[in-house]
Amino acid sequence: MYIQMTDGVPPPPEQSSLDHRIDELERQKEIDDWLPITSSRNAKWWYSTFHNVTAMVGAGVLGLPFFMAQLGWGPGIAVLILSWIITLYTLWQMVEMHEMVPGKRFDRYHELGQFAFGERLGLYIIVPQQIIVEVGVCIVYMVTGGQSLKKFHEIACQDCSPIRLSFFIMIFASSHFVLSHLPNFNSISGVSLVAAVMSLSYSTIAWTATAAKGVQEDVQYGYKSGTTASTVLSFFTGLGGIAFAYAGHNVVLEIQATIPSTPSNPSKGPMWRGVVVAYVVVALCYFPVALVGYGVFGNAVLDNVLMSLETPVWAIATANLFVVMHVIGSYQIFAMPVFDMVETFLVKKLNFKPSTVLRFIVRNVYVALTMFIGIMIPFFGGLLAFFGGFAFAPTSYFLPCIMWLLIYKPKRFSLSWWTNWVCIVLGVVLMILSSIGGLRQIIIQSKDYSFFS
């Protein structure tokens, strides 16, 4: 903006400062209109439903019977229900805190963290954990997509020569070299809808096909491990496996940012409606698969319940194909906040001009990087079970409670105060125990790990 001068006399400093401020606001608006999280705010409430379902229901749902076997009936059902309740509560907290400051929206998890913990500390606490979860999940989904494609190929073409997993990961990644150029959350709503439907579909196939098989002869529900130490460590692994199945909080504020908001109709109303429906869908996916799978196969169930089913072949093949379609959408949901972080850093800190070329380079590099790591370390999911424990538990179970206590300061020993502290303690215990179990799994499985398999 040019500063006008009258009779050779510059405007007063106050006017120059105002003009500079207006320029900054205009530039900020231009950037916000380009960034993926804030560029579109016209989402409907049901968008949040399938975004949350896609983010939360991963292919790990097929491993729930295996984790139930490590916990047993009583503890398994308790963890399944308690995790559902706690994460629904912490998700409600985040939805409420999105617009707690009148006239301001915390569109990103780290923005809420900065408000609660301070500008610098909030970044240091939130961003590393978000990156671990979001980038880690994207890598795992690269491998999962490739593995499911490989399994589908093996079933559909049993006489074909075996093909390395690496090539199936490349095939899976090719879809993301295209889809990753969709600019924002609203533009991937169709992909997310398909993914949400697929998650419900393959979960339904898994538990109905298992139920049709009937309870196996000589089924046993006791702990499978031989020693007490092994049983306890397996218990820790199962605890983390079930609890982290609900860890979708890393993208909830970014999803809510796409919903329009006015003082009379804030975004928390439609967002919460979508979250409740999403959690009903999640329960319809998780509970039948976990309970029916464990009930039919007992402690002999494999870590993917589909692998415990030998027939019908068509159902197993179809379910694997549905898994591929689901993790395509899930990858995009978790990649979008990463795109936003990187693109924000480039245009705000390094002063790159917002452009299609910049976006093209950033997103292709990210997809290529996650693909390469997935090919190089196809056992990355096992590593994430350990390292992810330090990020999944905080971001989903107790960081929202800590921020709630810091911001709202509920009266000591009130119901809100007690509820949040109970969630914090349980979350910290979960983080420690599940990480111990994850480390044990790495040690056990390390002999089977191979790079570039």
UniProtKB/Swiss-Prot annotation:
Keywords: Amino-acid transport, Cell membrane, Membrane, Transmembrane, Transmembrane helix, Transport. Residues 144-164, 209-231, 298-318, 383-385, 434-453 are extracellular. The chain crosses the membrane at residues 45-65, 66-86, 123-143, 165-185, 188-208, 232-252, 277-297, 319-339, 360-382, 386-408, 413-433. It is a multi-pass membrane protein. The keyword Transmembrane helix applies. It is found in: Cell membrane. One of its GO terms (cellular component) is plasma membrane. Residues 1-44, 87-122, 186-187, 253-276, 340-359, 409-412 are cytoplasmic. GO terms for biological process: amino acid transport. InterPro entries: AA_transpt_TM (IPR013057). Belongs to the amino acid/polyamine transporter 2 family. Amino acid/auxin permease (AAAP) (TC 2.A.18.2) subfamily. Amino acid transporter. This is Lysine histidine transporter-like 1. It comes from Arabidopsis thaliana. The lineage of its organism: Eukaryota, Viridiplantae, Streptophyta, Embryophyta, Tracheophyta.
